[in-house]
């Protein structure tokens, strides 16, 4: 059992609260079942393939991309494949999604460059990320505008 907080000892296990491979695989199986009803077949032989552009000019970004790929593919047991798309310089990486005019111009399935995000207690800092017409800090990177 994972304890988020141990009040008696004033400590936590320091676990990644969003990382739950068993739950991820269970959710994927549910999606596979539902998609099969629409004629969509997902399996190890016919996996979901997601493109992730990453900046290969720095080891930290390369390592992060490889770790994400390994984590997703192991947890989802080969039914999802992460295709790492190497961007030799930061400009190429930014133009894959961050510098696009709209979400429809983006060239990725997964992307980790979103610009500024919420980082303080004012509610506007969270709401401003999703402003309409592409004005939100993150709306464009999510492909919403």
Segments the model singles out, each with a brief description of its role:
Residues 53-57, 85-87, 113-117:
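Active-site-proximal beta-strand/loop segments in catalytic clefts of secreted hydrolases
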């Amino acid at each position: 059992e994972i304890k988020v907080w141990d009040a008696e000892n004033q400590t936590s296990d320091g676990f990644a609260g969003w990382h739950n491979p068993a739950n991820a695989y269970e959710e994927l199986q549910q999606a596979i079942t539902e998609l099969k009803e629409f004629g969509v077949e997902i399996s190890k032989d016919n996996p979901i393939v997601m493109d992730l552009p990453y900046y290969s000019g720095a080891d930290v970004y390369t390592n992060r991309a490889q770790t994400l790929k390994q984590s997703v593919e192991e947890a989802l047991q080969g039914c999802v494949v992460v295709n790492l798309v190497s961007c030799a310089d930061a400009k190429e990486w930014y133009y894959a999604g961050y510098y696009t005019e709209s979400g429809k111009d983006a060239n990725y399935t997964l992307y980790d460059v979103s610009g500024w995000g919420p980082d303080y207690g004012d509610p506007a800092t969270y709401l401003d990320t999703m402003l309409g017409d592409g004005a939100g800090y993150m709306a464009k990177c999510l492909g919403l505008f």
